[in-house]
Design a protein with these regions (language model features):
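Nucleotide-activated sugar donor-binding and catalytic core shared by glycosyltransferases
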Residues: 1-137
C-alpha cells in the first residue's frame, strides 16, 4: 500500500500494489495502471459507481453486492468481465488478484462489453427521431 498525496495522475508510484483514491476527477486517468479495479458503492444502498470507466481500459471490474440497478454491471457479469463479492469474500478476492490469467481474461471480457456498446448514441438518437420527431403525412 502506497500513500501519496497526488497532485497529478502521473505521480502514481511504480511498484505500488494498492492505490486508494479520495479525490474527484482522477479515477478515469488511473484505471490504466491497475490489474483489477474495485468499484466503490457496492455495499451502499445507492449502489455502485461507474463500471464502464474501468472497462474501457480492459480491466477486471470488481464490486460489492448492490449492483442490480445498474444494467452495465449486470451485463459485464454475464460476459465474465466483472465479479461481485460480499463482505465475507476477502479470500476469494485475494485469490483472484493473484491469478493474472483470470484477471486478463476478465479484462478482455470487460473490453468486449465496451465494444458491444459502440453505436449506442446513434441508436438512441434514431429512436428519438422516429418516435417523437418524425412527422406523419
Amino acid at each position: 500500500l502506497c500513500y501519496n498525496q497526488m497532485g497529478v495522475p502521473s505521480s502514481v508510484l511504480p511498484g505500488s500494489r494498492v492505490l486508494i483514491v479520495d479525490s474527484f476527477g482522477v479515477l478515469a486517468y488511473l484505471y490504466r495502471y491497475a490489474d483489477a479495479v474495485w468499484i466503490g458503492g457496492g455495499f451502499n444502498p445507492s449502489g455502485i459507481h461507474n463500471t464502464v470507466e474501468a472497462a474501457v481500459y480492459g480491466k477486471a471490474v470488481l464490486f460489492g453486492p448492490r449492483y442490480k440497478r445498474f444494467r452495465e454491471a449486470y451485463d459485464m457479469l454475464a460476459l465474465g468481465g466483472a465479479a461481485s463479492y460480499g463482505e465475507g469474500d476477502a479470500a476469494a478476492i485475494a485469490a483472484l488478484l493473484k491469478d493474472h490469467k483470470a484477471l486478463s481474461a476478465m479484462g478482455d471480457s470487460a473490453l468486449e462489453y465496451v465494444a458491444l456498446q459502440a453505436g449506442a448514441t446513434e441508436r438512441i438518437v434514431s429512436y428519438i427521431v422516429l418516435k417523437y420527431l418524425s412527422t406523419s403525412a
